[in-house]
Amino acid sequence: MRINPTTSGSGVSTLEKKTLGRIVQIIGPVLDVAFPPGKMPNIYNALVVKGRDTVGQQINVTCEVQQLLGNNRVRAVAMSATDGLMRGMEVIDTGAPLSVPVGGATLGRIFNVLGEPVDNLGPVDTRTTSPIHRSAPAFIQLDTKLSIFETGIKVVDLLAPYRRGGKIGLFGGAGVGKTVLIMELINNIAKAHGGVSVFGGVGERTREGNDLYMEMKESGVINEQNIAESKVALVHGQMNEPPGARMRVGLTALTMAEYFRDVNEQDVLLFIDNIFRFVQAGSEVSALLGRMPSAVGYQPTLSTEMGSLQERITSTKEGSITSIQAVYVPADDLTDPAPATTFAHLDATTVLSRGLAAKGIYPAVDPLDSTSTMLQPRIVGEEHYEIAQRVKQTSQRYKELQDIIAILGLDELSEEDRLTVARARKIERFLSQPFFVAEVFTGSPGKYVGLAETIRGFQLILSGELDGLPEQAFYLVGNIDEATAKAMNLEVESTLKK
């Protein structure tokens, strides 16, 4: 682990040897800077512009070198707004990539892309910093242990279980519940999980970031009385930030997580919401730099950029990073290059379906589209594997019969198919679950369901023991005992109405 104590976001001016350049062109967030011959900065070096604008306001803008243009000029992308910058202003080459604070000092705090705290709780100890650009761990350092990460969410644990130290993607279009699901996972895992978590808010809504912060303070994940005892560090580069900041904020969060893994030898949870915005910001920067766009207007370096980020998220012999990433799917098209490129890196995919969300089934996880490399008998056990396959087969058969039902009605089906449909509808409803983080909206208390309870519940539905219960009894409940209790209550209510 290379620690660089000389440069952090705000402390870059402490460098003794400064190379000065001058701005020669400004196009939005992109600056062209001229340097003296033989004093050219390297690619990814941090540049700092300091001075005053026309009304005397202090300016302090950090940029990152992206291209060497020739004629002693470089092209750099700004990490903050370029308002007030003028041609001829002095630019300092820090001589190193952007570095951010790492270690225990980051816990309980909110940072921007430069590693500067934005929570008004005072400065952060920056004695230990680390550059945001580094290579992925060598092949020989990797760890290949296989174990399941229990989430307490029935549909996930049964049909697409998560791997400890793996990469998980939550795929879905706009408004199907990706952020709510990621917040529930933080609630269930970060609280039960003894290690630390890092949350990277990449190009998402500022309101959601604020809600998450307030919720973490209420739940004790962030300890206001003693910040040092907090379990999470937050790094935000939201929708209103320039593309340079949104493109690099994921690396800032990852750098903090890597320190906990490599130096503190801890198991870390890394949440990224939303990895699509990382690609989107890269596409904007690519266009600003004048590169020819590739498929669907994305940057030609899409696979390289995604690979350089994802390959650093891995488990080594020192510790593990388990990463849970929300992936926005443009126009619900899973073949779009951004989600399609992300698919290749993941151990498990949780696909959210607009059809299920429209039916009011939350979490709206599609049981047939969601996959996991962990769903193998030798890893999860024969019973779990068999129940999961039977649930999928029943759901698949129901899907095939839906056209016939829509045209001819249920009565035209065979007795066997009618039974399959009845069980599939119970399964569909039993895959829904009340969330802790949605209590405020729904009014029903959240439920955590252990894996053994989940398997038992679906075993009873598939065996036919619960064929007599109404399907609404299975909707938004925790374990199967709650479903049978709800069925009894429904029966009592209907008797009283008569």
From Swiss-Prot:
The keyword Nucleotide-binding applies. Belongs to the ATPase alpha/beta chains family. SMART domains: AAA. InterPro entries: AAA+_ATPase (IPR003593), ATP-synt_VA_C (IPR055190), ATP_synth_F1_bsu (IPR005722), ATPase_a/bsu_AS (IPR020003), ATPase_alpha/beta_chains (IPR050053), ATPase_F1/V1/A1_a/bsu_N (IPR004100), ATPase_F1/V1/A1_a/bsu_N_sf (IPR036121), ATPase_F1/V1/A1_a/bsu_nucl-bd (IPR000194). F-type ATPases have 2 components, CF(1) - the catalytic core - and CF(0) - the membrane proton channel. CF(1) has five subunits: alpha(3), beta(3), gamma(1), delta(1), epsilon(1). CF(0) has four main subunits: a(1), b(1), b'(1) and c(9-12). NCBIfam families: atpD. GO terms for biological process: proton motive force-driven mitochondrial ATP synthesis. It comes from Calycanthus floridus (Eastern sweetshrub). ATP binds at G172, G173, A174, G175, V176, G177, K178, T179. It catalyses: ATP + H2O + 4 H(+)(in) = ADP + phosphate + 5 H(+)(out). It is found in: Plastid, Chloroplast thylakoid membrane. This is ATP synthase subunit beta, chloroplastic.
